[in-house]
Amino acid sequence: MARVTVEDCLTNMDNRFQLVLVGSKRARQLANGAEAHVDWDNDKPTVVALREIADGHVGREILEEQPEPVLDFEAEASALMEEEAAKGNADAGQGEGDAPKTPGQDG
């Protein structure tokens, strides 16, 4: 696990503010499953992001990339539940009089 310093990263960045923006965006991408350009070496995503910046694999152009759409899992789950409930109600209404009779039951 190689130590990464701010000075190592600043050789590829204009200033510390930009380093923070690029590093945080790249760390977020790594945490969400993006492929790393360097070995993980059992490091956290922030350290890997800084190592990528220091090695020149990631630069300021990452700030121009469009963010991935955020999935609203709660809204999606709620919509699916409503759809299933509506489907269940529709199924329950079909063939109400067609229930199978049990032996010994007069109809």
From Swiss-Prot:
GO terms for cellular component: DNA-directed RNA polymerase complex. Keywords: DNA-directed RNA polymerase, Nucleotidyltransferase, Transcription, Transferase. It catalyses: RNA(n) + a ribonucleoside 5'-triphosphate = RNA(n+1) + diphosphate. Transmembrane segments: none annotated. InterPro entries: DNA-dir_RNA_pol_omega, Pol_omega/Rpo6/RPB6, RPB6/omega-like_sf. Coiled coil: none annotated. Residues 81-107 are annotated as: Disordered. Belongs to the RNA polymerase subunit omega family. PANTHER family: DNA-DIRECTED RNA POLYMERASE SUBUNIT OMEGA. The RNAP catalytic core consists of 2 alpha, 1 beta, 1 beta' and 1 omega subunit. When a sigma factor is associated with the core the holoenzyme is formed, which can initiate transcription. This is DNA-directed RNA polymerase subunit omega. It comes from Alkalilimnicola ehrlichii (strain ATCC BAA-1101 / DSM 17681 / MLHE-1).
